[in-house]
């Protein structure tokens, strides 16, 4: 088992279709010479189990052996959501279904010219893990993989969810619908209790219940969103358990998109929940997609530091090169993160370290050679040669891992001057309330508060509503919905001496999305 470096600093490297095999040895040598000490690779089920029970590990074995040779540690990103084509045929009844009845096809990814992906987002594939046969097949893949690489001198651990998210529009297939009904039984107990909560009075059997296909601020929609979160985080735990059963010593990591403020309700991007399940958490933050305003350089690290609740966290995907031909860059100046410079890489890296990140990976060691993201993000050039950008990254890697920086890298940011409350229920209800109008009220309020403090040199921490004890001053943006226990928690905190600065309409809506007949609710 490999040892964790002082500061894991490296890149995502192997995705089966890229980079070319003839360059692997040279690339590893270059990376090691430049001070890079960690690679993450995509171990795609669809590329490895080529027929039932017939695994092709050759290319993956080579990655770990090269890593051991050159002193680089390896994070295996398990991509069990990339479904083998034979499994799509064999388990056709388990294909995920969109809200309009269309089934998910098996496609190639924009980030890998390899089959088995789906349109359904970062955490789910063509088939649902709610189907027992699919889950058993995925578990067999995970178990076989973990047993194979257990104890390898280059193995550091496993990334069990890439960019923790899923599609807002799935899954309406029979296995997930059945799981939803079971979830409702556990929550409500009887059909009568569910009928009162949902205002649907003609359910004769549990099988009459179908998940909602609209996004509206009603109890059934809130329940559907919550079920999907519970369901996918249970699937995350399933992957963790499968790997740990085969290799208890492997490090377990995951990374999201710092998306709790913008994507929690619809895509399940709950950084707090994801971080709670792993030893080290991380985040993807690409300035070419997000923008390079000063406050944005710190936002993701600050949010994930709060979500990590004291655990180590990494900037797991940091931009190292240009981006073009993508919707996020339209209408933006090329200097707005689109064409990364060495100085950009220095700024982005040091901002993340200042925010508390203690590991860093470029999301490409070198650019892809095919697909819509060809040529994007790599610090090294299309052939894997050094560039001024890679030289800058190398200098940061060496600096961060120098012995004289050991104490610095053990340090952490001080507690902020003020905490910004993150309330998942408020975010979820705001998403449903504003969906048809296409308003981004919640994220605008949260970002506005953070930016206001940042621009006035006030350090603001992100604080989950469950974590307010121990804070002195809190700011609560757009607190439109609260559960009774949350309202009681905040009330007791204020009575105990806490200072709360609260925007309008705190808890205006309560359980089930129902407005109070008097306010404050």
Regions of interest found by a model, annotated:
Residues 1-24, 28-38:
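An acidic-aromatic substrate-binding cleft motif
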Residues 100-297:
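Polysaccharide-binding and catalytic clefts of secreted carbohydrate-active enzymes
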Residues 23-44, 59-66, 70-81, 276-281, ...:
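Catalytic domains of carbohydrate-active enzymes, especially glycoside hydrolases
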Residues 18-33, 138-144, 262-275, 340-351, ...:
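Short, acidic/polar
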Residues 9-20, 42-58, 118-139, 163-169, ...:
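The substrate-binding groove and active-site-proximal loops of carbohydrate-active enzymes
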Residues 24-112, 116, 135-149, 233-247, ...:
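Aromatic-lined substrate-binding rim segments of carbohydrate-active enzymes
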Residues 4-9, 35-37, 68-74, 151-156, ...:
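Short, well-ordered coil/turn segments that N-cap beta-strands
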Residues 290-299, 303-521:
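Carbohydrate-binding surfaces of carbohydrate-active enzymes
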């Amino acid at each position: 088992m490999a040892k964790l470096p002082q500061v894991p600093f490296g890149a995502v490297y192997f995705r089966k279709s890229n980079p070319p095999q003839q360059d692997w040895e040279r690339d590893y040598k270059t990376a090691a010479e430049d001070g890079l000490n960690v690679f993450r690779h995509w171990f795609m089920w669809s590329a490895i189990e080529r027929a039932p029970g017939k695994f092709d590990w050759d290319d993956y074995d080579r990655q770990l052996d090269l890593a051991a040779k050159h002193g680089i540690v390896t994070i295996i990103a398990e991509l069990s959501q990339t479904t083998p084509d034979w499994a799509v045929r064999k388990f056709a009844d388990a294909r995920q279904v969109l809200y309009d009845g269309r089934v998910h096809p098996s496609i190639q990814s924009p980030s890998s010219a390899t089959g088995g992906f789906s349109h359904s987002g970062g955490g789910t594939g063509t088939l649902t893990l709610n189907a027992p046969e699919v889950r058993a097949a995925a578990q067999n893949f995970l178990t076989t993989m973990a047993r194979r690489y257990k104890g390898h001198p280059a193995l550091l651990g496993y990334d069990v969810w890439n960019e923790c998210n899923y599609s807002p529009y799935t899954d309406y297939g029979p296995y997930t619908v059945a799981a939803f009904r079971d979830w409702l039984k556990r929550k409500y107990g009887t059909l009568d209790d569910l009928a009162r909560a949902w205002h649907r009075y003609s359910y004769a059997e549990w099988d009459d219940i179908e998940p909602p296909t609209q996004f509206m601020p009603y109890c059934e929609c809130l329940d559907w969103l919550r079920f999907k979160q519970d369901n996918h985080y249970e699937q995350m735990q399933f992957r963790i358990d499968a790997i740990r059963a085969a290799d208890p010593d492997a490090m377990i990591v995951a990374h999201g998109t710092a998306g709790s403020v913008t994507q929690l309700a619809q895509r399940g991007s709950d950084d707090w929940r994801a971080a709670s399940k792993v030893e080290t958490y991380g985040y993807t933050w690409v300035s070419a997609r997000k923008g390079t305003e000063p406050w944005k350089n710190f936002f993701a690290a600050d949010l994930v530091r709060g979500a990590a609740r004291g655990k180590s966290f990494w900037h797991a995907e940091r931009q190292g090169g240009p981006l073009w031909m993508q919707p996020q860059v339209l209408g933006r100046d090329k200097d707005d993160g689109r064409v990364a410079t060495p100085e950009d890489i220095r700024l982005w890296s040091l901002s993340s370290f200042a925010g508390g990140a203690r590991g860093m990976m470029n999301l490409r060691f070198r650019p892809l050679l095919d697909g819509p993201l060809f040529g994007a993000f790599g610090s090294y050039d299309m052939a894997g040669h050094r560039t001024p950008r890679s030289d800058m990254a190398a200098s940061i890697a060496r600096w961060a891992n120098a012995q004289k920086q050991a104490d610095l890298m053990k340090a952490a940011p001080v507690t902020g001057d003020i905490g910004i409350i993150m309330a998942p229920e408020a975010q979820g209800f705001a998403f449903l309330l504003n969906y048809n109008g296409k308003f981004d009220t919640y994220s605008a309020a949260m970002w506005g508060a953070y930016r206001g403090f940042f621009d006035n040199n006030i350090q603001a921490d992100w604080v989950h509503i469950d974590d307010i004890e121990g804070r002195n001053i809190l700011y609560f943006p757009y607190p439109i919905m609260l559960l009774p226990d949350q309202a009681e928690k905040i009330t007791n905190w204020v009575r105990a001496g806490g200072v709360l600065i609260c925007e309008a309409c705190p808890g205006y809506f309560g359980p089930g999305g129902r407005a109070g007949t008097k306010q404050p609710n």
